[in-house]
Amino acid sequence: MNASGSVPLGVDSEVGRLRSVILHRPGDELKRLTPRNNDELLFDALPWVDRAQEEHDQFATVLRERGVEVLLLSDLLTEALEVSGAARIQGIAAAVDARKIGHALGQHLAAYLRKVEPKELSSILTAGMTFDELPIDAGSTSLVRRMHHGGDFVIDPLPNLLFTRDSSFWVGPRVIITSLALSARARESSITDLVYAHHPRFKGVRRAYESHTAPVEGGDVLLLAPGVIAIGVGERTSPAGAEALARSVFDDGLAHTVLVVPIEQRRASMHLDTVCTMVEADAVVMYPAIQDTLAAFTLRKEDDGVSIRGATPFLEAAADAMGIGKLRVIDTGLDTVTAEREQWDDGNNTLAVEPGVVVAYERNVETNARLEASGIEVLRIAGSELGSGRGGPRCMSCPIARDPL
């Protein structure tokens, strides 16, 4: 704890003892999902929201029982809106899209939102708003209003806020606000940006990788060791984003080596952490199908710029960058069909709460059994509804404080 009683902020590994984390408890934004929009909003099914909330509460309880401070994004957003007029202006500006709803309706909507209490505004910014819910009659001045159905969204919901890993992550003492690849998630970064800019808890926090538009998502970034970062490039993070992030962390002295790891561009492996996560300081759990083929380009900070080498096998490149003899892979020993099923259900997407202790979905029975057989303690949580958006415990968490290794 520091003098204010808060946990000092900063993260330099995947497995250092977890002290504080940001989660987002599923809310009304999930109730906006319908068979008509779930694909567009990146959910494979319509979750049972009450059960998803129960599962998420269990996740938060498991973390708290291990001494982790759990901060909820909706609370942080409400608190920031309460203390800062600038936060309100920022949130409203990001939510009111004149390109979609036109100038006339945009003015009406912004004027209404400026009068809303912080808690209600927080809910609108995350859960969205339909035309029927807009308590003003702009029909006489807005063609957009007249031509839309009442159930259409004047502000789109953000159901993927559940996955707090993607819109921000920490490298050392700095926070990085990302640029998300798909339009359904683009506004999530404005929520996290607002919280970090205006919530008192984050006063004085410095940022890295600012003012970049090339896509980078936190699920593609693994802090393999202090100074060593892996960045997946695939469906979400682009080569341009990975290079910009690498150069940024080099310039800020946050890393000496970055491994850029190409991954297959498909939904099942949308992020690097869907196929590989760290469970100990020298060990990973990895989807067996890619173990022998995953490669990496090695970028290093040099006196005269940045050197690029490779591609070479990922496990070799990682061990070399980390200064260890070998990066161990927990042998799940799964047959092809079981491995594919459990990878789809985020069996490799674990969250380490300390070295050798991870949170995982209980449904991935075989992967969890192999982890335990290798000496890893597995804290099981339910995920039948949470998994509808294709994300596991690591996806659903943004660590903001870990102990150094």
From Swiss-Prot:
Gene3D superfamilies: Arginine deiminase, L-arginine/glycine Amidinotransferase, Chain A. It is found in: Cytoplasm. GO terms for molecular function: arginine deiminase activity. Its EC number is 3.5.3.6. It catalyses: L-arginine + H2O = L-citrulline + NH4(+). Keywords: Arginine metabolism, Cytoplasm, Hydrolase. Its main location: cytoplasm. Pfam families: ADI. The active site is at C395. Pathway: Amino-acid degradation; L-arginine degradation via ADI pathway; carbamoyl phosphate from L-arginine: step 1/2. It comes from the Bacteria. Disulfide bonds: none annotated. One of its GO terms (biological process) is arginine catabolic process to ornithine. GO terms for cellular component: cytoplasm. PANTHER family: ARGININE DEIMINASE. Belongs to the arginine deiminase family. This is Arginine deiminase. It comes from Rhodococcus erythropolis (strain PR4 / NBRC 100887). The gene is arcA.
